[in-house]
Amino acid sequence: MGGVQARAADFRTKASITQKMHDKVRRIGGSGAELALSEACLGVAKVAHLLRACGDELFEEAAALWSFDRVQKGTLDRLVPGCDAEARLQASLGLRVGGLGMRRARDVALPAVIASRAVARPKVQQLDAELAKAGLLPAGRLLAEHDAASGKAVGMLKAELDEAEATQVERLVAEAAATAAVAWLRRMEGKGDEAVAPRA
C-alpha cells in the first residue's frame, strides 16, 4: 500500500532505527562483541521482511537501500580502521566463505524478493483460482501479474551478475518453484513438514 515511495520511506525508517541500535551497542566498548552483535542482531535480517516483500522496488530506489548499507559501512569502518572497498566486500560475505556476514541490503534485495515469490507462487496460484471461482478476477490474472513481477526481478538480478552466474539464476529459481509447489501440495494434503531454514 502507498506505492514505492511509501515502501522506501518505511525502509529508511528501519535503517534509522538500526542506526540508533548500533549507537547503543557501541557503548559495550569491545569491538569483538560489538561486531558479533552487529552481525547477529543488526544486520540485513532487520530489513529482510521488507526485502522479501518489495526488494525489487527498493533496488530501483537505490538511496533507500544505501540508507541501511551506510549504517553497516559506518560500523565496519569504525570497528576495522583502514577498511577499504575490497575489505568491505569480503566482510559482506558469509562466515563460511571467510566473510563477517555483514551482508548489504543491495546484495540481498533481489535474491530475497525472487525467493519469496518463488515460494509464494503455489499459494498465489490457488488464490487466483479461488478469486476466479468467486467472480472477483478473471482466471489467471493474479498469477500472471505475480509471474510478470517475478520475471522482472529475475531479469534485474541477471543484469547484475556476470554471464556464468546469470545463466544459473533461472535454473535455481525453477528448482525453488518446483520445491515450493511440492511442499504446498503436501501441506494441502495435510502432510507438510515445516523445516527450519538454515542460517547463512
What are the residue ranges of the model-derived segments?
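Nucleic-acid-interacting cores, centered on viral/eukaryotic replication and modification enzymes
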Residues: M1-A200
